[in-house]
Amino acid sequence: YAPNVYMNDPLRRYVVFGCLFEGDRLESKRPRGWAGMQSIPRVVFLQENELLIQPAHECYMLRKECLGAYAKQEKMDAKGQQIEIELSYRPSEKSVLQIVLQASPDGEERTVFTLDYGKNDLFLDRSHSTVYSDITKEDIHAPIVYEERSVQLRIFVDHSSIEIFYDDRLTMSARIFPGREDSVENSVKVSDDVSMLVGRIYRLACETEI
């Protein structure tokens, strides 16, 4: 919604700041006195007549320590509310990747992002993202097409926001509002037919560390 686009930096990039709305009921917004937030900076560019989008290079500066790394046949997990998940992998035609975000230990709260190449579908399931009843929990879908090559995936989580960048071709953004203080668990699981090249979870800097 109403993105702000700038092209005035020395690299002559088109830098976009999107607007992320929470989508909950109006009466629940009034006590807060605010609504919506801006996305991380994104760069849009043309490559072989295709419009691509990726996080601005400066977002790498937010990375602090690595909280988890993927090992073959194991689940990658880490705790945190400000994280970046970086994956580079080679899928097959039926591969499935499941990424659980901001989950409580008992699973009462959880947001689940699934990449299902057999169904050509990206799916963000927010149905259990919060225990609150006045928050939008609609599912978000986007189509994908299997290609026999490696894929890059980056996911940014910042407390109530999730921003997903799929292979520089597609973005998916959403708001979530976990109500439990222990909803800080994040994990990545992949089917056996996925060849994982890179898998890491980073803690992102808070405002006092920038």
Predicted regions and their residues:
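Beta-rich accessory regions
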Residues: 1-210
